[in-house]
From Swiss-Prot:
It comes from Homo sapiens (Human). Its main location: nucleus. Residues 197-206 have a biased composition (Basic residues). Homodimerizes. Interacts with NCL, NEDD4 and YBX1. Interacts with HNRNPU (via RNA-binding RGG-box region); the interaction facilitates the recruitment of long non-coding RNA Blnc1 by ZBTB7B. Interacts with HDAC4 and HDAC5; the interaction allows the recruitment of HDAC4 and HDAC5 on CD8 loci for deacetylation and possible inhibition of CD8 genes expression. This is Zinc finger and BTB domain-containing protein 7B. Residues 34-115 form the BTB domain.
Amino acid sequence: MGSPEDDLIGIPFPDHSSELLSCLNEQRQLGHLCDLTIRTQGLEYRTHRAVLAACSHYFKKLFTEGGGGAVMGAGGSGTATGGAGAGVCELDFVGPEALGALLEFAYTATLTTSSANMPAVLQAARLLEIPCVIAACMEILQGSGLEAPSPDEDDCERARQYLEAFATATASGVPNGEDSPPQVPLPPPPPPPPRPVARRSRKPRKAFLQTKGARANHLVPEVPTVPAHPLTYEEEEVAGRVGSSGGSGPGDSYSPPTGTASPPEGPQSYEPYEGEEEEEELVYPPAYGLAQGGGPPLSPEELGSDEDAIDPDLMAYLSSLHQDNLAPGLDSQDKLVRKRRSQMPQECPVCHKIIHGAGKLPRHMRTHTGEKPFACEVCGVRFTRNDKLKIHMRKHTGERPYSCPHCPARFLHSYDLKNHMHLHTGDRPYECHLCHKAFAKEDHLQRHLKGQNCLEVRTRRRRKDDAPPHYPPPSTAAASPAGLDLSNGHLDTFRLSLARFWEQSAPTGPPVSTPGPPDDDEEEGAPTTPQAEGAMESS
């Protein structure tokens, strides 16, 4: 037997990979330790080169070829904390919506997009060379009856030229502290053709995509301001350079010319994803276009007043913008409020139930894990949902938000008010299928059915100390009267026949004296047995 030092013990941690990816995603949302900034069409995304190179062949070639991995930013030094000194990539050939969806996929292993944006995501995945996303998008488009778009030759050529130019610039080996590599001009992008509108299909999709309320890690560019004095060429070059001080490697600030000076780097705000929100309000300022300084403002005709008049892709893009980052001085009357609901279903990995709605899958998973994160501060009762806790708090505060419009009654729940309204309207929607008696409340009908009040026959009142009547077995019992019609109000006839049937089946013998007041249909001293009635008639 070997010594304890020679014995190797393997302790597996199955959740380590998912927890590690979750921590990286949290760092991306907060902007911590990000060593790369991706710019596209006026928007910026803070991210990590290692994560992108692990899931995209294009980024792997971009970061490793020509520079041996020591390219674009201070990835090997400790000065890239919080995004300071990070490298910059200009990827204008990839749209912001598709790029945001692919970045979220890289950090969460879940592709979140809309049906209308699926062709754009497929095109971006082809440019960035992400095979698994390409296969998934092709399968969904084919299953939905949509034709997959062919690759855009212009965008493919621009992506190839950018990769070659970047590899050439980083291979030149510019030392730290010197001027940045020569800017390699790229051909201007062609005017975008009119985008075809994808037809929505009613066929079921083969894959379940998670939909979240908002995209995280969107950085809204600041509003461009006119400086007090014109900037010289050197000042513009210094202002547009990122990571020139801090021990960065060669090729730190390489970016194709965009025609305008880059906005100064500063602290950026991030919007973490809140899974409990079922829907959220999107505030959009008409005077600022898509984003502050991100593009020309839209005309009132393009904005419109009807929600259907706005492109759903535009609404999905606006969902990534937080209202705190948009024009803080605007009044509420100048803001356009939009609500976006989830479209893609999600499947529970435990019970395989299909969950609809953003953020509802984590709430459903609490039914399997038993987690109850919402606790009452008064009595300590815990709940799995926040809305249930709010309803519970009404018991402590005495709040009754549902009031009757016809009387001063107030109720704790909406269904109590609905049942109460039947008293004013006279509706009796709950009907017994045996006697067709209607009730205003469902619990009244259930009580009626459990007690069998509709078929119960009482020939006379019986005291507690009376012996129960003797019922003969079914073999010796007399045949029940045939030909009874229980329809058209013949229920009383059936009850009378049933009473006579039990009287004939009862054993003969002296009647049991029942002291007390007589029945309502009997007179004082009246006979109570058939023998007595016959004796009186004969006399």
